Amino acid sequence: MKLGISITGGGALGIGPLQFMRRLEADLGKKLASVGDAFAGTSTGSIVATGLANGMTAETLYNLYKDNLPKIFKKVSSTRILSKSYYRYDNSYLKKMLQENFKKHMYEFKKPVYIPATFLNGKSVEKVWGKDDGD
């Protein structure tokens, strides 16, 4: 039997599932990365799924979130939101943190990871990319 682990989104609330996963790893006596055969996540859950697919422990991911939450979820000004941009957070620190802590290419992951994505224009839904689909 194969086991897929899916993690929900929720921005800064993504730390909640990580608290549960830390406890689960402690109870199991092993990393979820070694238990799951594939990982999936939406939004902030995709970051957690990517970490697990790279062999990181829930504890490592929890600490990464805890130490970086204020910088990742630093709100942008309301003027910027009302202009051409529709996002509420500046992603520059998040991008830097991901580049420093995660593998650069999906084919380098230890396990398959699946991350749904779409264009924000609402006109189309694109393919869900996985480990075997290249970059």
Put a short name on every predicted segment:
Residues 75, 103-112:
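Short secondary-structure capping/junction motifs at helix and strand boundaries
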Residues 2-6, 11-101, 127-129, 135:
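Patatin-like phospholipase
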Residues 108-135:
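Active-site gating loop/helix substructures
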